[in-house]
Amino acid sequence: MFAVIKTGGKQYRVAANDVLTIEKLEATAGDSIEFTEVLVIGEGADAAIGAPFVTGASVKAEVVEQNRGKKVIAFKKRRRQNSKRSRGHRQHHTVVRITDIVAAK
């Protein structure tokens, strides 16, 4: 069984025991979280498609760790003006493991 969940402005296709990196959530390692914004749930022809969400469906996950992504460098240079600027940014991420997919009853 799979589900498509929405979190952090993105959509993810998940199944049981999947490990995925999502935008930062306020939780610590070992916490249990639940995603209620489920867009699609099921398997094959038995898939239920929400409009926009499937009512009563949820996906349970466990937080594995909080980490940061690779550094992204934003570099600006203005030609012939001896002017340049370099800025770095590292996005915060949460790594979660999907534990259970609960279908609507």
Swiss-Prot record:
<keyword id="KW-0694">RNA-binding</keyword>
<dbReference type="GO" id="GO:0006412">
    <property type="term" value="P:translation"/>
</dbReference>
<dbReference type="GO" id="GO:1990904">
    <property type="term" value="C:ribonucleoprotein complex"/>
</dbReference>
<dbReference type="InterPro" id="IPR036164">
    <property type="entry name" value="bL21-like_sf"/>
</dbReference>
<dbReference type="GO" id="GO:0019843">
    <property type="term" value="F:rRNA binding"/>
</dbReference>
<dbReference type="Pfam" id="PF00829">
    <property type="entry name" value="Ribosomal_L21p"/>
</dbReference>
<comment type="subunit">
    <text>Part of the 50S ribosomal subunit. Contacts protein L20.</text>
</comment>
<comment type="function">
    <text>This protein binds to 23S rRNA in the presence of protein L20.</text>
</comment>
<keyword id="KW-0687">Ribonucleoprotein</keyword>
<keyword id="KW-0689">Ribosomal protein</keyword>
<keyword id="KW-0699">rRNA-binding</keyword>
<dbReference type="InterPro" id="IPR001787">
    <property type="entry name" value="Ribosomal_bL21"/>
</dbReference>
<dbReference type="GO" id="GO:0005840">
    <property type="term" value="C:ribosome"/>
</dbReference>
<dbReference type="InterPro" id="IPR028909">
    <property type="entry name" value="bL21-like"/>
</dbReference>
<dbReference type="GO" id="GO:0003735">
    <property type="term" value="F:structural constituent of ribosome"/>
</dbReference>
<dbReference type="GO" id="GO:0005737">
    <property type="term" value="C:cytoplasm"/>
</dbReference>
<protein>
    <recommendedName>
        <fullName>Large ribosomal subunit protein bL21</fullName>
    </recommendedName>
</protein>
<comment type="similarity">
    <text>Belongs to the bacterial ribosomal protein bL21 family.</text>
</comment>
